[in-house]
């Protein structure tokens, strides 16, 4: 059996390891979040002139866009990072959690169709399932499309195609009559490409959601 001294030493080492893990994970997330925000500065004016930024812990950055441009009446960006500061980070990855950029917009008109295109293996996709009416139909594919009608399914196909043309990998693409009307959850964009391309694509997708 371990002596009380050895047990104390072991507990001390474990505590230091946990603190070191927390510090390293926090630093990594803060660095990633700030780097992505710097990258977005070039393209942000395409959707709004000013932004209010809040860090919610070390894993979430909320960016509220002030005075958003048409077709948005309000818009929010969320940088959702993996919990690298927590010891169970590997388990969260097994459950499909990945660094994700989320754009949520309230549109100036209510969409005429409702749909959810989801990656069911992702955190975003599983989180959305409980919000989908059971009466909706499902079409399987690389993204599972939940839709209320044939026009909604057609709209989903057009949105997914446009998103992929823009280099996006959506885990969730949502068009709803309730607010927020429009959402897209994507893997963090490639910062080697211009940020304007990302925000131009978001603008086009929101316009397409209203057609």
PLM regions: where:
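Structured extramembrane domains adjacent to transmembrane segments
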Residues: 71-197
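Short amphipathic C-terminal alpha-helix that caps PH/PH-like domains
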Residues: 195-210
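Residue-level detector of solvent-exposed, low-hydrophobicity positions
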Residues: 7, 46, 130, 143, ...
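Single-pass alpha-helical transmembrane signal-anchor segments
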Residues: 6-24
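N-terminal topogenic membrane-targeting module
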Residues: 24-97
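Residues that form generic nucleotide/phosphate-binding pockets
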Residues: 40-43, 159-162, 205
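Short, strongly hydrophobic alpha-helical membrane anchors
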Residues: 1-4
């Amino acid at each position: 059996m371990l002596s009380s001294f050895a047990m104390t030493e072991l507990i001390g080492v474990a505590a230091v390891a946990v603190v070191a893990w927390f510090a390293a994970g926090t630093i990594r997330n803060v660095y990633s979040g700030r780097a992505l925000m710097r990258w977005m500065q070039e393209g942000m004016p395409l959707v709004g002139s000013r932004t209010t930024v809040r860090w919610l812990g070390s894993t979430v950055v909320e960016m509220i866009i002030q005075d958003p441009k048409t077709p948005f009446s309000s818009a929010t960006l969320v940088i959702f990072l993996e919990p690298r500061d927590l010891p169970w980070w590997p388990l969260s990855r097994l459950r499909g959690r990945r660094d994700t950029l989320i754009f949520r917009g309230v549109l100036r008109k209510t969409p005429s169709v409702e749909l959810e295109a989801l990656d069911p293996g992702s955190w975003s996709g599983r989180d959305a399932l409980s919000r989908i009416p059971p009466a909706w139909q499902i079409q399987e594919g690389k993204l599972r499309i939940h839709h209320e009608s044939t026009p909604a399914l057609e709209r989903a196909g057009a949105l997914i195609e446009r998103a992929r043309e823009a280099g996006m990998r959506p885990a969730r693409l949502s068009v709803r009559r309730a607010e927020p009307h429009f959402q897209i959850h994507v893997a963090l964009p490639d910062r080697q490409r211009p940020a304007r391309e990302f925000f131009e694509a978001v603008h086009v997708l929101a316009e397409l959601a209203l057609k």
